[in-house]
Amino acid sequence: MARLNTVADAMSTLKNASDTGRAECIVQPAGRLIGELLRIMKEAGYIKEYTRIEDGRGGQFKVVMSGLINKCGCISPRYSVSLDEMEYWEQLYLPSKNIGMLMISTSKGVMGHHDARRNGVGGELLGYVY
């Protein structure tokens, strides 16, 4: 069966692993976009580390969990968000202004919403984590 939304599958794998208290999990297939989302989550401290494993079938990521993920998810459809609209989407998906992070695909790469606001760019919403 074909996977329709690999980002949603990856986020649900991370959430399930965090909810069950696992130390690590396997996210597959290993795409570039999922790798960028994992990089952002690692920089923010939501995961400890991740490594790419080539298995000849699309690859996979081995993710070491830090136990800090309360909820994460994919935002579908991928709404376009301008700099002025960022606060609306924060209120919609995050529990508080200082807790959590929206992940946005911008013209300068994939980044968290705090970095996007600092750089003065908008983009498409990919997911959230807190």
Swiss-Prot record:
PANTHER family: 40S RIBOSOMAL PROTEIN S15A. The lineage of its organism: Archaea, Methanobacteriati, Methanobacteriota, Stenosarchaea group, Methanomicrobia. InterPro entries: Ribosomal_uS8, Ribosomal_uS8_sf. Keywords: Ribonucleoprotein, Ribosomal protein, RNA-binding, rRNA-binding. Part of the 30S ribosomal subunit. One of its GO terms (cellular component) is ribonucleoprotein complex. Belongs to the universal ribosomal protein uS8 family. One of its GO terms (biological process) is translation. It holds the Pfam family Ribosomal_S8. This is Small ribosomal subunit protein uS8. GO terms for molecular function: rRNA binding; structural constituent of ribosome. It comes from the Archaea. The keyword Cell division does not apply. One of the primary rRNA binding proteins, it binds directly to 16S rRNA central domain where it helps coordinate assembly of the platform of the 30S subunit.
